[in-house]
Amino acid sequence: MGSSFQFFDIIFFALIAAFVILRLRSVLGKRTGHAQRDSDSYQTEPLGAGLTQIQVADPGFDPADFVAKANSAFEYIVATFAAGDADKLKPLLSKDVFAGFESAINDRAEKEHVLETELVRIKEAEFLEANMSGRTASIKIKYTTEQINVTLDEDGEVIDGDPDRIAEVVDIWTYERDTQSSNPNWVLVATETLQ
């Protein structure tokens, strides 16, 4: 009897997802072909289905609001990592990600190196994946940014990077959140730098 309830739950949520997608399409309108491609890449079907699953589990979830807050988190985490403040990073990162960040911060401190990072701008923040696994929502974002990254030694001499060069950096960050938790914050659970 329990499996028949699960079957009906799946059907029920699939119908809700289909309804939400149809409503979104009617509200958002159609492209004329003259519009520029925007960063609302979450309109693709598999990604849209994942975002819809998250919205069903967390009715307060808004993809545009998520990207705005994720961009702010990206800026804050990059700046805080460069400043070497592990204590401020800890509540924002999973245990594994925090361990990697803390290790890099400690390694810099032992060598008396200083990382100077200037995030010039976020060119694009693009949804790559969104899904639900049990109660946990997971979203993967691809950030294309312009940054100046310089590492200085204990004498203030540049040992890595160029203070006059703006580099394009592509990062993929994965955020997760327990949708049944009263804590509204997402946690950074994975990072990958492509360039």
Walk through the language-model features, giving the residues of each.
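Core segments of small alpha/beta cavity-forming domains
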Residues: 46-130
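Short alpha-helical basic/polar micro-motif
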Residues: 22, 87, 173
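Structured, amphipathic secondary-structure segments that form assembly/contact surfaces
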Residues: 91-195
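Generic detector of bulky aromatic hydrophobic side chains
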Residues: 5, 19, 53, 81, ...
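Juxtamembrane and targeting peptides
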Residues: 2-72, 76, 151-155
